[in-house]
Amino acid sequence: MFRILTILIISFNITYSQDYYLYVAAESDDTVSLLKFDGNNLSEKERIVVGSYPTENEGPHGLTVDPNGKYWYLTLAHGNPFGKLIKYSTETNEVVDETTLGLFPASMQISSVTGFLYCVNFNLHGDMKPSSVSVVDPETMTEITRIKTGSMPHGSRITSDGLKQYSVAMMSGELFEIDALSLEVSRILDLEDHSKMDHSKMEHSNMDHSEMKHSNVKPTWVIPHPNKNIIYIAGNGSDEIIEVDSDSWKVSKRIKTGKGPYNVEISPDGKYMIATLKSIGSTGIWDLDSGKLLSEVKNSTSVSHGIAISPDSKYAFVSVEGIGGEPGIVDVIDIKSQTLIDNVEIGKQAGGIAFWKMEI
């Protein structure tokens, strides 16, 4: 009887393996790929053509999936001059609705509490002046308000309780906290390491405010810890991950990295930090309990970009842009063993990436 039970359990595990699904945007090809990973092989199930103008590159940039998994959302960053937010059905991968946002809308996420979508307007090609976060009701696809933040905001992420939204301003080097309920900026933190600045050699009389705020950190991403009051920021210009204590609202640690950290994510179990090192085409994995860098995994091509981690904290899916006319590639990394398991080619300049679902 015991042997029969054992055989049945083994058979169940073999037959009912987990499948993982995610969406990845190819910014230079105006396509989005639906990928499936079966635990061994990563494959492209569908390539969806996006945008309205076949002769123009509209730049699919940011991706997110709503909490119930019924819809996915895409920002088209290139506009005339304003970009768009497009809503798609996960059942058909067809357009449901759209709305116009600000200049170069980029990363975004939906609050599980308010149901609103919070999208940064990166304003890549505009003047170096404060931009905004657009707040959208995804049910009606109506932009409710734009909240003024810093210069070139990026990395819109929301706390696990759905109450706070964070973004970083790349050119002004600031972390912004928005109250998801009141839709107002509640706190701003300067991320520069002022201990390294020689203030005695600064000529303040000839320096205006915008010059003083030009960032050496150049933060590009922010992620709150899933169950601790800690925020992690990718310092792309300073080659570091900045840890911020959200209770004291102070920098608590600066973790040196390889060159050009770009995106950073925390595993849902709170144990691991994953960061793309864009300038060297690698992905770093840290143990958060010890603070130790476990490994730098070389990606399959150049220019590492975005990260999506599976809800079971087993796998990190990494979009890698490639250079020139190369196809973009998505790598899947086993987090515990820090090994690259498989990859798949998609359209050119793989960028925005969002996990959809796990399925037996």
PLM features per residue range, with description:
Residues 2-13:
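Sec-dependent N-terminal signal peptides
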